[in-house]
Amino acid sequence: MGKTYSSPVNPIPKAPKGLAIHHWLNFLQAAYRLQPGPSEFDFHQLRKFLKLAIKTPVWLNPINYSVLARLIPKNYPGRVHEIVAILIQETPAREAPPSAPPADDPQKPPPYPEHAQVEPQCLPVLHPHGAPATHRPWQMKDLQAIKQEVSSSAPGSPQFMQTVRLAVQQFDPTAKDLHDLLQYLCSSLVASLHHQQLETLIAQAETQGITGYNPLAGPLRVQANNPNQQGLRREYQNLWLSAFSALPGNTKDPTWAAILQGPEEPFCSFVERLNVALDNGLPEGTPKDPILRSLAYSNANKECQKLLQARGQTNSPLGEMLRACQTWTPRDKNKILMIQPKKTPPPNQPCFRCGQAGHWSRDCKQPRPPPGPCPLCQDPAHWKQDCPQLKADTKGSEDLLLDLPCEASHVRERKNLLRGGGLTSPRTILPLIPLSQQRQPILHVQVSFSNTSPVGVQALLDTGADITVLPAYLCPPDSNLQDTTVLGAGGPSTSKFKILPRPVHIHLPFRKQPVTLTSCLIDTNDQWTILGRDALQQCQSSLYLADQPSSVLPVQTPKLIGLEHLPPPPEVSQFPLNRSASRP
């Protein structure tokens, strides 16, 4: 079954996309001449055909209806053939020169001269006394004067509309003139919005009917460009001015809302600035008095607000607010001099630190000298904290003594999850000191004192010893040994060990910089070389005890139940020293 089309609700169907309004009005006038009248189905087929015809290269302006009739397919549904045939019949009559006098001069006797087709003008129209209407070019000084008057006004504001309306009345511009004036005065966005609103107003005016407007002679914009069509030109000018009042966004202009009264500005001057800003920012027709009264109180300074609140005139008429604040004058602010303490004059005596006069010792820029020689290197020129021997070499990374096999990826991921989901601290590479379960923790080191060459020696790593022990043969001959008491595993000892209050340097195989100790114990019997916790803490190293593979002991069936069949337990020698030294 075919589609059912009801009677049109809107008597004026919408024009197809891409077709000018005046062309669509020509098709509508021809369609309404059909007997019987057209249906909605006829308008639907007409719009469908025109959409296809617009895309063809034969679509011209003005339209050649004879060529257009050839594009209609045979047996095309609807009454499109009849509508185009009516337009073909009306075309010669419309193109014929007028045989009647123009409406502006009905008293002119015949014969009437044939008016040649005038090209659309783009300049203001001049109406000299006793002469036909002509055009003259826009002068730059006129355009600049108009733009200077509206430069501080928003498009659509009362001051803007007043200036533009006076310019339109003085120059009597055509449609093309108004378009050029809009491009010169406003931005591209405002011009685009104005053009859209103007097209809507023109479509409504052409539909309702305008005195002297002929739809077959072209759109209103083209007819308004004719100097002789003064009535149509006035109608187009009114529509062009009305399009400014419907521009969106003019009421949201925040320039006038940000005007504040200064702390010393008179209230009358502040209200005058508000009044000018509202004239330039508010669109035409918007009530200005309520906004002006509200801003005059809310944007005033605190002193004027207190005066208006005390008199109950926060929302009174503007004249009463001006009279209330008329007697107010800015307060005189006395300048207060800041009292500053007088500086103590510099002394005439020399500084106790640098020996120069002109400043106190507390203001001296020379650093304080050390009280004595450095206890590490015996240099009297610097403090102990500035000793170069304490400054570690942070540029180079320390080498590992032992390369351990890397863990498997799944083991490392499981550890990261247990330690906090993979969040790790910055990497720090520590040297590893390997130990053996079968041997004592022995490490080959080199020991040196000030102005002596390093001497190699085998040292025992003892984490239980508080202080490092060195044999007596490594001690320099001029050393000043002091008596001390050492508490070890065998009890206190007072004669076996001496303390050496002298810096000693221990070179480890896994460090580039030596470990410097301020003092150490000297074994007078030349028996022990022990690295205590004082040296190991400076190493920042880790002790590594390798896992030994498990071994299966041969077990024979015992004849008797007991432990006689098992081998004797291994004998492990104990560490010979676990002592603490007390320094004098």
Swiss-Prot record:
Motif range for PPXY motif? 109-112
Pro residues: bias regions: 98-113
InterPro entries named in the record: Aspartic_peptidase_AS, D_retro_matrix, Gag_p24_C, Peptidase_A2_cat, Peptidase_aspartic_dom_sf, Primate_lentivir_Gag_pol-like, Retropepsins, Retrov_capsid_C
The record places the active site at 462
Specify where the region named Disordered lies, as residue ranges: 93-117, 564-584
Q: Covalent lipidation (N-myristoyl glycine) residues? A: 2
**Which class of enzymes does this protein belong to?**
hydrolase
Its BP terms in the Gene Ontology are: proteolysis; symbiont-mediated suppression of host gene expression; viral translational frameshifting
Short sequence motif named PTAP/PSAP motif, residue ranges:
98-101
UniProt remark on domains = Late-budding domains (L domains) are short sequence motifs essential for viral particle release. They can occur individually or in close proximity within structural proteins. They interacts with sorting cellular proteins of the multivesicular body (MVB) pathway. Most of these proteins are class E vacuolar protein sorting factors belonging to ESCRT-I, ESCRT-II or ESCRT-III complexes.
Its subunit composition reads: Interacts with human TSG101. This interaction is essential for budding and release of viral particles.
Q: What is this protein called?
A: Gag-Pro polyprotein
The lineage, from the top, is: Viruses, Riboviria, Pararnavirae, Artverviricota, Revtraviricetes
